[in-house]
Amino acid sequence: MLADVAAASTEVAASSARLVKIERIATLLARSAAEDDTQAVAVIVSWLSGELPQRQIGVGWAALRTLPPPAATPSLTVDDVDDRLSTIKAVAGKGSQATRAGLVHELFSAATDPEQKFLRHLLSGELRQGALAGVMADAVAKAAGLPAAEIRRAAMLAGNLPAVAAAAVTGGRAALADFRLRVGRPVGPMLAQTATSVDDALQRLGGTAVLEAKLDGARVQIHRSGCDVSIYTRSLDDVTHRLPEVVEATLALPATELIADAEAIALRPDGRPHLFQVTAARFGRKDPGDLGPLSVFFFDLLHVDGRDLLDLPTEERFGALDALVRQDQRVDRLVTTDTVAAQEFLERTLAAGHEGVMAKSPHAAYEAGRRGAGWLKVKPVHTLDLVVLAVEWGSGRRQGKLSNIHLGARDPDSSGFVMLGKTFKGMTDAMLEWQTQRFLELADGPTDGYVVHLRPEQVVEIAFDGVQRSSRYPAGMALRFVRVLRYRDDKSPAEADTVETVRRFYERD
């Protein structure tokens, strides 16, 4: 029942103890397995991970702002809600927005108050309860009675923990045999931790690192079997039909079968990268014909002609890649033990218009779907002093705290502020306590709604990775990957950074 999931979500969010979270989720999964409901197991894992199996269903916060009166008693099952969400996603054509709104109203009319709260947080992307991938994998293992390492390995190779959970909890160890590296089935990409500098990276990697240019493009995973090529994004969406140049480049390689990591990027005639949005536009179009070409640069090889390379060290995988792909189609690379040489490589990469560098251990295996210690990213940190324009009430562990802040830059022309994004990243518990009290004092209107609007008086220093084009905000720009560093009580709003300062970052990016 949906009521059971909502109750479990509340309990998981209320606890900071990892073992308590694992036990509560495992109990819920085991109950669904006992009812032989494989679909429900997969859906529950998705939901409690804060995700929808349908990914996006075309329902924004506006449709969730005003809800119908809740039902008195629970009646919705997990499968019923999942089917309804699939129906909402499938709505298209003229009048689709109104149709979706009607279907959302019907769904919420059938939900009790706790169920409505759960669904609203889930659909708005605000279900933050501390049930991260590691916790969820351990909960699946406990429910299935299997070692967590087996669940993680299967999820790594499947790129899909919900599917692994459904198989393991209902079918046991034998059901995991199907989850192996397979051409045509994407795996979760290996992710990088962050290093503060190339010197920090070298030290953490034991003194020797393989440095790579970190291109500001779109990461893709490429699968080839004979003449068939499939291309997936880092979130495992199939974008093959949107990237014909990548298909062509892959078919030109001297291999029959392969799985490779690569970066697709739009380059200017002089070889410098276009703005990230130019590359990203290709991933949002069904017909790429009216947009510029993309280049592809390979940087890792997971499988080639019947041979799995996942568990091999970096240097061996790169050796296999070098034997397969021409140098001008590979990401620039330097193996070094020298901090000066590493810093020069970083500076050359930045001067060429790229994001920074990746530093990789020559001995690390490919940890698919994990943020491994063998990969470190080094990028310059940009900071801005902005003004908090509004703030949202939190959920889960942040229930009762003002959490997600709306950020604005100063606009000298209008003597006001222009919104550039939102963030709840980087906030400590002490900071949440402080800002809740502070922002209630600055409230400019009611404080019982989801969003509390503020008098623009509080300056905050934030770090960000870049600026991208956005139609969501009046300035046409949005900050990327924003984190709070500290509140600047020593600065007045008149000292906040201007829209023009942000625009210079945008033009440079």
Swiss-Prot record:
One of its GO terms (biological process) is cell division. Its EC number is 6.5.1.1. It comes from the Bacteria. It catalyses: ATP + (deoxyribonucleotide)n-3'-hydroxyl + 5'-phospho-(deoxyribonucleotide)m = (deoxyribonucleotide)n+m + AMP + diphosphate. Keywords: ATP-binding, Cell cycle, Cell division, DNA damage, DNA recombination, DNA repair, DNA replication, Ligase, Magnesium, Metal-binding, Nucleotide-binding. The keyword Coiled coil does not apply. The keyword Cell cycle applies. One of its GO terms (molecular function) is ATP binding. Its cofactor is Mg(2+). The active site is at K214. InterPro entries: ATP-dep_DNA_ligase, DNA_ligae_ATP-dep_bac/arc, DNA_ligase_ATP-dep, DNA_ligase_ATP-dep_C, DNA_ligase_ATP-dep_cent, DNA_ligase_ATP-dep_CS, DNA_ligase_ATP-dep_N, DNA_ligase_N_sf. Disruption phenotype: Not essential for growth, no effect on NHEJ. In quadruple ligB-ligC1-ligC2-ligD deletions NHEJ on blunt and 5'-overhangs is 0.22 and 0.12% of wild-type respectively; only 4-fold decrease in 3'-overhang NHEJ. ATP binds at E212, R219, R234, E263, F299, R371, K377. DNA ligase that seals nicks in double-stranded DNA during DNA replication, DNA recombination and DNA repair. Belongs to the ATP-dependent DNA ligase family. This is DNA ligase B.
